[in-house]
A protein has these predicted regions:
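Conserved N-terminal segment of class I S-adenosyl-L-methionine
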Residues: 1-120, 126-130, 142-145, 231-232, ...
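S-adenosyl-L-methionine-dependent methyltransferase catalytic module, highlighting the catalytic core
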Residues: 13, 18, 22-24, 30-37, ...
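A generic structural signal for alpha->beta connector loops
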Residues: 76, 104-106, 155, 223-226
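A short His-aromatic
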Residues: 134-136
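C-terminal beta-strand of the catalytic ATP-binding
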Residues: 280-282
Length: 282
């Protein structure tokens, strides 16, 4: 692993990087997979959908705990990661150091900003942006996409995952799922999700929630040819340990998300919480 600690001289003002500290990374989605030495399904899916091969080069923007970096290296891919959080750099560096030499030597990490990529034109075959879009203000996000297009090779691909889906937060959750969860909690003595629509952390860092239409608009403006879809992760029944709990989970998805109708329009627009995109540079 090559550890390059730099500060971009062209950083754009955005969310304070100090908000992304050790406590933040221990609490966010997928942390339990990382603590168990596993790869979260989200990152496995991103790699599978990308079509990346081991002879390709990749950039991971906003690497966080370093989960995707390590997953790509295990596939034989030479990957560079950037993040502007100092804590992210330290967390990822420690995790990468525990990996076998043939994997960790394929990873480079850089302390840098997503809006001013410190790479030459046409440097990478693939760029991954998983759970970064919603953390960038609109001008930052457009600049980041412009930079991605610049450093991608011809026919290179940008793989994007962002959550939450703004329509889910504005309509699906508060108007249907949250009240339905409260009913199920009373009927079956469960502890289903009844959180605020947006937590304090969400309000601090999720400053640019997307819909499939708004994300498409950014990518079109940048000049990418893109495919955008809503992921089914959130609205598909989770596998449970016992038949009784599985039955309850299936009933919850039916009751709270209208499953399996939640997999198709217009229901998926309101209940699917994951937005994916693959954008290609001509």
């Amino acid at each position: 692993m090559e550890d390059i600690n730099k500060n971009s001289q062209q950083q754009t003002a955005g969310v304070d990087s100090r908000l992304y500290d050790q406590e933040y990374f221990e609490a966010i989605d997928g942390a339990h997979y990382s603590s168990e030495g596993k790869t979260a399904p989200k990152f496995i899916y991103a790699i599978q959908k990308s079509g990346i091969e081991k002879e390709n080069s990749a950039l991971d923007i906003g690497f966080g705990r370093g989960d995707l970096l390590m997953a790509l290296a295990k596939q034989g891919v030479d990957v560079t990661g950037i993040d502007y959080s100092q804590d992210a750099l330290e967390i990822a560096r420690k995790a990468i150091a525990k990996q076998p030499a043939e994997w960790k030597n394929k990873i480079k990490v850089l302390h840098s900003n997503a809006t001013a990529l410190e790479f030459s034109d046409q440097s990478f075959d693939y760029i991954f942006m998983t759970d970064l879009v919603e953390h960038l203000y609109p001008p930052e996000l457009q600049k980041c996409f412009d930079e991605c297009k610049r450093v991608l090779k011809p026919n290179g691909k940008l793989i994007v995952h962002t959550a939450p889906n703004r329509w889910y937060n504005d309509f699906g959750y508060p108007l249907w799922e949250q009240p339905m969860n409260r009913i199920l909690n009373k009927l079956f003595r469960q502890k289903l999700l009844t959180r605020p629509i947006r937590t304090e952390t969400d309000l601090n860092v999720h400053i640019n929630e997307q819909t499939i239409l708004s994300l498409k608009k950014y990518l079109v403006k940048t000049g990418f040819k893109s495919k955008i879809w809503l992921g089914s992760e959130y609205v598909t029944p989770i596998k449970k340990d016992s038949p009784g709990m599985q039955l309850l989970e299936n009933f919850r998805q039916l009751f709270c998300h209208a499953y399996p109708l939640s997999l198709i329009p217009p229901f998926n627009l309101l209940f699917c919480n994951d937005i994916w995109a693959i954008a290609k540079k001509d």
